[in-house]
């Protein structure tokens, strides 16, 4: 399987809310995570991020979905980029406020680096969190 195939399978597992259990097969043990987005700025591992996504999508944003706009792979850095659109409505419990019934349609990018063992070794999420939080009525 190519590195792009691994990155793509990981992306779909994470965004399909499979959490750590569904994503671990694609992820290196020490895979780091980074995001300059307030809700996830303190998340430091890829698998912890996968669990965060699962909690968000099975809790306050139950029924959320995503669409990939574009995907590419840079062989020189072993990094896949996924530009996607996340859509979710705050209808479930677990958010910072009671369910608002408001929806966000939020652009984001995953930069997923795959190592020579064909495992995700690093991930960066680029996301305008304040936009999404405002649309959801959370700020």
Each language-model region and where it sits:
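C-terminal and inter-domain tail/linker signature
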Residues: 1-139
